[in-house]
Amino acid sequence: MIPKDINDSHIEQAAKEIDLNGVPSQRESRKYLVQVGENSYPPKYIISLAVKYLKGQELDSLDFIASEAKACLQKLGYEIVTK
């Protein structure tokens, strides 16, 4: 489950980490991307990393589904785009 207190700062920190390290092939999105600034990221992966900045540990991708990630990101004002 995605923590309810996740915020823009956590998402932006996760985006910076992805910019530095890339996206592991097994964490690529099949259908959707989230727009953060000028770049797009896999919604589930960015949420997993963002939780690390909130709770200190990455959220396992098996602990939530893609629609939860999309809803959380949209609630924070991010645009979800089809790949």
Model-derived features: positions:
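Terminal leader/tail segments of proteins
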Residues: 1-83
